[in-house]
Amino acid sequence: MLRLAPTVRLLQAPLRGWAVPKAHITAKPAKTPTSPKEQAIGLSVTFLSFLLPAGWVLYHLDNYKKSSAA
């Protein structure tokens, strides 16, 4: 544990000089509320954009295995 302290200090030294700007977050309601239809479309597009490429790769995994074995 004693050897870990200098290593941690060495890794923290560059981070001390960085100034992170404060985020401007407000708690006001939205100017234009999002309808349930818009929310459903947005969630569907988001999930499909992640799931379709992953499903395509998994479906063609055998082809990848066969082509790399040559």
UniProtKB/Swiss-Prot annotation:
Single Gene Ontology BP annotation: mitochondrial electron transport, cytochrome c to oxygen
Transit peptide (first-last residue): 1-24
Compartment(s) of residence: Mitochondrion inner membrane
Side of membrane Mitochondrial matrix, spans: 25-35
Keyword match Cytoplasm: no
The keyword Transcription is annotated on this UniProt entry: no
Keywords: Membrane, Mitochondrion, Mitochondrion inner membrane, Transit peptide, Transmembrane, Transmembrane helix
Assigned protein family: Belongs to the cytochrome c oxidase VIII family.
The protein's name: Cytochrome c oxidase subunit 8B, mitochondrial
Name of the coding gene: COX8B
